Amino acid sequence: MRTKTKLVLIPDRHFRRATFRKRNAGIRKKLHELTTLCDIKACAVIYSPFENPTVWPSTEGVQEVISEFMEKPATERSKTMMSHETFLRDQITKEQNKLESLRRENRETQLKHFMFDCVGGKMSEQQYGARDLQDLSLFTDQYLNQLNARKKFLTEYGESSSSVPPLFDVAGANPPVVADQAAVTVPPLFAVAGANLPVVADQAAVTVPPLFAVAGANLPVVADQAAVNVPTGFHNMNVNQNQYEPVQPYVPTGFSDHIQYQNMNFNQNQQEPVHYQALAVAGAGLPMTQNQYEPVHYQSLAVAGGGLPMSQLQYEPVQPYIPTVFSDNVQYQHMNLYQNQQEPVHYQALGVAGAGLPMNQNQYEPVQPYVPTGFSDHFQFENMNLNQNQQEPVQYQAPVDFNHQIQQGNYDMNLNQNMKHAHIPFMDGNYYNYHQPPTVGLTSTGHMPSTTTTTTNNNNNNNV
């Protein structure tokens, strides 16, 4: 680090000569810059023991500048001139003024302590003279005048703009009050300890959605909403972000083996209420509808191990009618509802075990698979795929095989028929050829009826 050079005579002659040469060139450079930048006249005459006198810019230039200077009056010439004595006198005056300022500040501080000691009853602790008491009286009057001027200013103009209220509520402080307000929606604070919500006075309706019991989650609040009805039986579910109507999920409670949904996502952009009911299907996932405009009603599905993805672009309700008379129903764990439907979709229980029924993707009419009901032991479809692009309803018939029973004729059943007197069909290997066994009273024969045919050879393979 370069240190500051002391302004003293350099004792070494050689070093002093080198310094002269360097600084002589520097001062001439500075004079050239000064005359060029400021458009002034300047000259320099330098005498030294090391070389002949040096003039700048030239001998003629020096004579011209000196002649012009001597033509000025004496007062004007000495106005900016300063000798060494004058320079020292000016420096002493500046230091004396600075010292007087410090003494005045110290005296004011001493008088202020003296004044507050008198107010506190501590006047006898120190010894004050007559001058001190006089200065105290003057200082007290000056201090009172300043206080009165400040009080008058605050009375006329109030607080300054720099004094603003705190942005956050302080613990124990009263919350602000909003008066004469028609309707204000105040979202609650999530997991903020000690925070105070603003109080709304004279308010027609304030809609505040409740908090959900989700650990560590901050759920978004639906603003500008007429009413919000939120269930309390679901966990880990996302509230609709842009809905304009209440969401009312309905969950059935009359089933014996019911497992509630663990992850249910509500409709994100719906404008009508959505009604959800339990699905009695184990291992199946039905995605929720994302952009529907009509209510969706779901009923329980009795399908074990099957997945029913909903129609993606349908405009009519899909109503598969499946029997619901089954004892062992297990609900879905993850249900994803239809994505873009505009009409309600009604689902009923499917008596199909281990089957996957993908729904129609682009249909415009309902798909109604008809399956017989009222049987205790029946063989169900393994993989039944519904029509992908149909526009008319498709009706499915379910052949059922039982041991030691052969029926004659074609068997067709739907949901609306009376199942009390239905005959159990028997399939002999041909999906389009069914036989009806003769009606024989069991009370008279004591065993199941049996028939033999010449058209079938696979009776021993039809075991349920």
Swiss-Prot record:
Asked if the record carries the keyword Nucleotide-binding, the reply is no
Give a GO molecular function annotation for the protein: DNA-binding transcription factor activity, RNA polymerase II-specific
Q: Where is the composition biased (Low complexity)?
A: 451-464
Gene Ontology terms: cellular component: nucleus
A GO biological process of this protein is: positive regulation of transcription by RNA polymerase II
SMART domains named among the record's database cross-references: MADS
Disordered: annotated segments: 443-464
Q: Which residues form a coiled coil?
A: 85-114
Chief location of this protein within or outside the cell:
nucleus
Compartments where found: Nucleus
Record's subunit section: Interacts with AGL62.
- Cross-referenced PANTHER family, in alphabetical order? SERUM RESPONSE FACTOR HOMOLOG (PTHR48019)
Task: Provide the protein name.
Answer: Agamous-like MADS-box protein AGL92
- Originating species: Arabidopsis thaliana
Gene from which the chain derives: AGL92
